[in-house]
């Protein structure tokens, strides 16, 4: 190849004109470089030569190329300095406000540089950097976020059914621009937030729906309104769902719900007949956009989970079964009446959708338990005189007029009542009256009430009355000098022994009529000396009986103290008789001596 300088031989005549020499040399240089570029095109073919005009950095249009402008054009076409990336990064997808403002190019749109393209090959030197044609630009890598078609395949059917009121412009844009829907799926804000994708929707969204059929005025077509019932689940803490509900606004679903808002009261469906409650289970009836992820449609949430049935609310008034079916209310239930009543209550019972307690029986009648008015008394109360005679001391109705004191549970009688008992005033109630003098022996011998017996120890009282209990009606009256300590103590011991011996037939006692004379012998002697034998009164602290009183009182206190702390052994007879078994639950010989 000839040197470029050899071409200057024909310019001898034009040596003085520099403005002609320089363009000619530049043209020759471009011709030599064009031959070298043809060899590079064999290894790096280009599909299309893009011709454009260059702009001078100073704003002047250049008819010829310059090295500075060629370098700037190549860098702008290969590196794309001033353009944002076509696909949003994963961090940008978390902020819908940023990803929505970015103008996303379509797949079939040619990427145009803001700078003018390089001129044609006949005027510029091409770059040696390999670059694919812009007209065949396509996306082959996977998206960093989940595709809208996959999210749509897992969207609940109730949420898809609510999108029937979308505008035609939204539908056309969804079908035409598949790449735009791939990046930015349509999200609308509604009451139930059912249009959000599964990974952006809160947990309170519904997974089932109810079709409410309402006939038109002319009997024409039937409108199908699908309402999504929100479940009682906790709200999700997904930040993306909150951002989407705040950034997007779609009032189509709100208008659909507001037309029939009166059918919902406090979160419950009202006036829904049983025939109109249907579950949306037919996947073919729901229109879904065409997508390449058809295999995911078979694994929707409605196919994996089954919605709980909802029983319709009966608007008819409750019928009183006692009025409508008087034959069911019977006094003594029979098998047939019980079966009819059970079927009627089982059919008409209100079974709630959610119950905290699960039981095998819904009412007490199914357990065989009847109401209080239907109960039959199988053990009637005995009203015979014998049953009223032997009663407990705690609820006893004694025959003599008496009164109670706070010191103990035994009843007190007055002196006049005792005189009437001695005179036979109560002979129609009692067969015999026994007066027990609990004073010491020297006191009794000094003076006592007529017909009274002296028993001043516990063992003596038990041997006298409980070894061989009397079978006739007897009234026992205890007294001492003042009836404050010795008489009440011995009388309580006698009552406790009688109760223990009759524990197998409680509340019956051998001697239910036990009284204490109020005021004791001293008061009785002062008022009724003629009823004393001998007519005398010897006090317990008499000077002539000091030693005897001290010894007797020590024995009385010792027995009382030991009996409180002494352990009881079966076989040890408290009656001092080998013929009596003192076990409280044994059927001993004393149990045969009953008063009937």
Curated annotation (Swiss-Prot):
Q: Which UniProt keywords apply?
A: Cell cycle, Cell division, Cytoplasm, Hydrolase, Mitosis, Nucleus, Phosphoprotein, Protein phosphatase
Write out the GO MF terms: phosphoprotein phosphatase activity; protein tyrosine phosphatase activity
Compartment list: Cytoplasm; Nucleus
Q: Phosphoserine-modified residues are where?
A: 99, 178
Tell me which InterPro entries the record gives: MPI_Phosphatase, Rhodanese-like_dom, Rhodanese-like_dom_sf
Q: What is its EC number?
A: 3.1.3.48
Q: Which residues cross the membrane?
A: none
Q: Catalytic site residues?
A: 480
Domain named Rhodanese: which ranges? 429-533
Its PTM note reads: Phosphorylated by srk1 in the N-terminus; phosphorylation promotes nuclear exclusion.
Matching Pfam families, A to Z? Rhodanese (PF00581)
Q: Record's Gene Ontology CC terms?
A: cytoplasm; cytosol; nucleus
Q: Which reaction does it catalyse?
A: O-phospho-L-tyrosyl-[protein] + H2O = L-tyrosyl-[protein] + phosphate
* Function, as annotated: Tyrosine protein phosphatase which functions as a dosage-dependent inducer of mitotic and meiotic progression. Directly dephosphorylates cdc2 and stimulates its kinase activity. Required for the G2/M transition of the cell cycle. Required for induction of meiosis II.
User: Could you describe the subunit structure of this protein?
Assistant: Interacts with rad24 during G2 in a srk1-dependent manner; the interaction is increased during osmostress.
Similarity field: Belongs to the MPI phosphatase family.
For this entry, the protein name equals: M-phase inducer phosphatase
Native organism is: Schizosaccharomyces pombe (strain 972 / ATCC 24843)
